[in-house]
Amino acid sequence: MNLSEKDILYNWHPYTQHKTAFPHPVIVKGEGVLLWDETGKEYIDAISSWWVNPFGHSNAFIANAIYKQLTTLEHVLFGGFTHEPAILLSEKLAQILPQNQKKFFYSDNGSTAVEVAFKVAMQYFYNKGEKRTKIIAFENAFHGDTFGAMAASGISFFTEAFKGSLLEVIRIPVPTPENEKEVFETFRKLVETKDYAAFIFEPLVQGAAGMVMYAPETLDELIRISKANNVFTIADEVMTGFGKTGKNFACDYLIEKPDMMCLSKALTGGTIPMAVTSFSQEVFDGFYADDTNKALFHGHTFTANPTGCAAALASISLLLTQEMQDNIQQVNMQHKAFEQRIKTNPRVKTTRVLGVIFALEIKVENEQAYYGDLRNKLYAFFIENGIILRPVGNIIYILPPYIIYHVHLEKIYSAIEKALEEVY
């Protein structure tokens, strides 16, 4: 029995209907932007393996930091103990995040980072004697697959089986020039009820919705309205964080700053599962009391794992180099050049670019399912051509590692152009 057959026998893959799925390629090696399967076939990782790998596969700098930490202190419980990597990582995050972010709580992935934020927001008001248990989120948002995060997500078939078992979440449209006045008024009426603990958002880019982009000015206004009504704001930067939007964080485009931020994915350069939720001093002070019952009773076995912290410190060190910042801008310029080239294609409805993110929407007669026929044909076409792209319905997006070469980007662009001719 080969590896592919064993995979089918034993493994349950995410977002997969196994009865109809084709066997998955067995990846055996990664280097830079390239991956190889067991047959020797080469793939360009055009989406940074679900947006986690900005510095390339098998990055020696991060790997060495991990090895050094593994042979010094691989893990120690964070309840009742602390350690240098966590202290240094929190110090570094305080330096690069918005200045109001003062305290850091570590967890395991993006979903758990969101769960922490929700629990903190609700308990903050509980500690003050207020009952605020509702959340506001954007339509078509995606915040993760655990129960709280899933409740705030807007992709209906992800949550259909769990109706009645989720947090109460009210969704508002993403603001556009056409609807922003109505959105602001609806939002204001909601927060004035004093029923809401928090407003959560993916700043500037809704990733799983198809890289839907919106203006920072509109988000600034929503944050201002939230603050005026004592509703916490949670920036879910799990996808956008660590350079993807052209700045270190999407919140760097904002005048107003969130009360909490959720970070994961690229935090460790795609090496070790880890996440962090950051908080303003005001939020932390809501738990700082003589009463033990007002403490945050939440934790994970691998909270602030030293090896993960070491990987994150190395990853942030790479991000802040001038070379990597230049790489991000270079990818952005190449995306913009491709946008000019492709947007006149009669099969293309819209295009959009921010930082290293490129997306195009294909013209279709009928609305396409998230995992519909067109998407599946496009995905199979790209895999056949050695390109890892995962279209969302009729939207094709690129989010490559920052170290990608021009020749690899051109192969991706050419594959998209070819797909528009052959798959459409």
Language-model segments: which ranges?
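Conserved N-terminal phosphate-binding loop of PLP-dependent enzymes in the Aspartate aminotransferase
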Residues: 1-424
